[in-house]
């Protein structure tokens, strides 16, 4: 079974059972963003988590092995047409250089890890319209001279 097949089975089971990513993550005892990413094929699951997910969603045989496989973390190089994803590209396009300057001013020359990393999505109620709060929390990795 391939990762894409498992992703499709997960999405179908989620829909049929009227579940949320947050609910699935809570059942697994893991973070919502990470579980969603793993279910969409962009992270590999530890065996115990994969077993629990397969049992919870009654996934077909072979799903556990596919969930545990190391993913190829690649994506299309074209800017996505989905408006929400496009806006994230736009944020980086408009503010990327600014973020780089501010981060390097505070930390020095380096990067933010996407390996030693967590991400959270929260909803903030606001009288002018509810706000999306994205928190990206990555370890700073300084470049070294040699």
Swiss-Prot record:
Active site: 87, 90, 113
Matching Pfam families: Cyanate_lyase, CYNS_N
InterPro entries on file: Cyanase (IPR008076), Cyanate_lyase_C (IPR003712), Cyanate_lyase_C_sf (IPR036581), CYNS_N (IPR048564), Lambda_DNA-bd_dom_sf (IPR010982)
Keywords: Lyase
Lyase found in the keyword field: yes
GO biological process, one term: cyanate metabolic process
Reactions mediated catalytically: cyanate + hydrogencarbonate + 3 H(+) = NH4(+) + 2 CO2
Enzyme Commission number(s) from the entry: 4.2.1.104
One annotated GO molecular function: DNA binding
HAMAP family: Cyanate_hydrat
The family this protein is said to belong to: Belongs to the cyanase family.
NCBIfam families noted in UniProt: cynS (TIGR00673), PRK02866.1 (NF002773)
Function: Catalyzes the reaction of cyanate with bicarbonate to produce ammonia and carbon dioxide.
Protein name: Cyanate hydratase
Species in which this protein is naturally found: Teredinibacter turnerae (strain ATCC 39867 / T7901)
